[in-house]
């Protein structure tokens, strides 16, 4: 088995174990790149399992349960119940990727879709909420993660609208303001670094495309969304869009 197929099998089996735990599963919202890969056909590989904890009072229980679950699959090389929630890092073999399970205890009222894979079901964060968090992640990470750029492009390709309410709760700014921040970050990002850490997660054809198109297409997509958002705001305020003077119609 290749490294990707081996890692995929570990991700799959751990998710199946979580789904079969009737006490653990309802407390978790599956999110992030791996959820997009499993349930929404994200065209890149993702190596970690990310969740949001719905009930912070059950944090210790969730941490202990995940630790007992993960230890069946290999060696725990790092684990802690940190300020922002549980983290467990699993190593299952020499030369392989580590598998990180991370649970955020910051619940912002995100919506969930119950989605089914091969007979087991998980609560998966809505695409709209995930996209809002992804726009914020681009800004908040220490250094730009190129997988965030790829995922933003993916959300735009699927015509997902980010949930502005999440952005307002987390950043106290509008969607338009967040988009402006992100475009500025992307415009400063050097294109020759676009494949940094991203290339191993893509097919060879996708690597060729990403090298020349990913950054520019992502910027263009966000710029289009900014234009659309400005029009939406004008209509919300009751401002009509009038044609220029002297353009009252075609003369025959």
Residues covered by each model-derived region:
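Structured mid-to-C-terminal alpha-helical surface segments
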Residues: 1-28, 39-42, 53-252
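Glycine-rich beta-strand-to-loop/alpha-helix junction loops that act as flexible
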Residues: 30-34
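Conserved donor-binding loop and adjoining core beta-sheet/short helix segment
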Residues: 45
């Amino acid at each position: 088995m290749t490294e990707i197929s081996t890692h995929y099998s570990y991700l799959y089996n751990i998710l199946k174990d979580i789904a079969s735990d009737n006490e653990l599963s309802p407390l978790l919202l599956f999110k992030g790149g791996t959820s997009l890969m499993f349930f929404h056909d994200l065209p890149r590989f993702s190596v970690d399992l990310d969740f949001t904890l719905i009930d912070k009072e059950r944090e210790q229980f969730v941490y202990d349960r995940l630790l007992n679950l993960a230890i069946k699959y290999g060696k725990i090389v790092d684990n802690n119940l940190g300020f922002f929630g549980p983290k467990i890092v699993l190593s299952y073999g020499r030369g392989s990727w580590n598998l990180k399970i991370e649970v955020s205890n910051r619940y912002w009222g995100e919506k969930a879709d119950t989605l089914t894979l091969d007979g087991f079901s998980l609560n998966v964060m809505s695409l709209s909420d995930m996209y809002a968090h992804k726009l914020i992640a681009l800004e908040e990470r220490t250094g730009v993660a190129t997988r965030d750029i790829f995922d933003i492009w993916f959300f735009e390709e699927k015509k997902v609208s980010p949930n502005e309410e999440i952005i307002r709760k987390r950043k106290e700014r509008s969607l338009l303001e967040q988009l402006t921040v992100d475009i500025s970050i992307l415009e400063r990002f050097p294109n020759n670094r676009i494949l940094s850490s991203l290339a191993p997660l893509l097919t060879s054809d996708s690597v060729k495309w990403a090298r020349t198109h990913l950054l520019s297409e992502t910027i263009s997509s966000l710029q289009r969304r900014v234009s659309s958002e400005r029009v939406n705001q004008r209509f919300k305020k009751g401002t009509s869009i009038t044609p220029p003077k002297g353009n009252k119609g075609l003369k025959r």
